[in-house]
């Protein structure tokens, strides 16, 4: 369960980074 939570956390971080890239690109 903890491993899954860790994965979700890193995934959220990755998505946030991608979102930032989109923001800066526009």
Curated annotation (Swiss-Prot):
UniProt protein name: M-lycotoxin-Ls2a
A GO biological process held by the record: defense response to bacterium
GO cellular component, one term: membrane
Molecular function in Gene Ontology: toxin activity
Functional summary from the UniProt entry: Forms pore that permeabilize the cell membrane. Promotes efflux of calcium from synaptosomes, causes hemolysis, and dissipates voltage gradients across muscle membrane. Potently inhibits the growth of bacteria and yeast. May function both in the prey capture strategy as well as protection from infectious organisms arising from prey ingestion.
Keywords: Antibiotic, Antimicrobial, Cytolysis, Hemolysis, Ion transport, Membrane, Neurotoxin, Secreted, Target cell membrane, Target membrane, Toxin, Transmembrane, Transport
Keyword Transmembrane: yes
Family: Belongs to the cationic peptide 04 (cupiennin) family. 05 subfamily.
Tissue: Expressed by the venom gland.
Domain of life assignment: Eukaryota
Cell location: Secreted; Target cell membrane
């Amino acid at each position: 369960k903890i491993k899954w939570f860790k994965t979700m956390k890193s995934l959220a971080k990755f998505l946030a980074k991608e979102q930032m890239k989109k923001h800066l690109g526009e």
